[in-house]
């Protein structure tokens, strides 16, 4: 007997531009077994980055009564339509106060629930702030207690109790939810290349070395270690030894429509300009910014916690640094750039990303989460 096609819903917030990418993968490779649809409560302006969802009800643009009414009606509709619910960052269809009840209903009806956590949803800002302020002690082996707030612990408890599968996007989160599965960020490789190549950018002058540091949030740049990074960058610039130009979107005092320091399209332009991209010095793992910058052919610098280095994929091309070694690592990279960088570097980096950070080559965890056989 032929298996009936199942329906999966992605929602209800799209962190890291996952939803359209995952849906595209299903359409291209699994359409005979799975139909993907999406619902989002948060919609970024198209000027930031154009993406699409099957259903949406923007929480910041919808009257609360209309929002609650739409969400409730969509929830009832979803019970009859979907077999699998893949929730990103802990956001479900109904309000957070009703999350436990909502997840319980899915479980009672035999629905498959996947909870997909990306970082700030279960790792508290207070913990990272404490880590940032005491990063030198942390590097010596000291830690700073609770990694999750009370509300996050409730979310974690709900996920453990009701979810069939829990995914985390950075391996440090496995310490918070030990039974979770690490699934790395993946890049829509060809789409990214096409979009970056279509963006204009400011050309470099001779012997100029351009360094980009762009924390995602202007208000929370300390969580990426921006203060420590700026201290090193300012020292390098002040030395006048190198012709350095800095691209620092979070430092620009401009009014923005979102909390992001730069739109994704602006980032594409910055990738084209930069020689070096610095990700973060606090969290302890690299993110989508690093992956994109590698594909763009840039030197990428990031901090990876010592205890997490065993989780790195083989031959990782990211230059590892912490707040103590960042200056030394940057000087080594600058000297290499001025001498003439390896002509094969870009190809090496792109091949590494294709192997370990594309959904075409890294999908086993998702197929397991969706309760599908591993072959596509």
Predicted regions and their residues:
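Conserved catalytic-core segment of nucleotide-activated headgroup transferases in glycan assembly
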Residues: 185-262
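A charged, aromatic-enriched C-terminal amphipathic alpha-helix characteristic of glycosyltransferases
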Residues: 17, 339-371
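Short hydrophobic beta-strand element within catalytic cores of glycosyltransferases
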Residues: 299-302
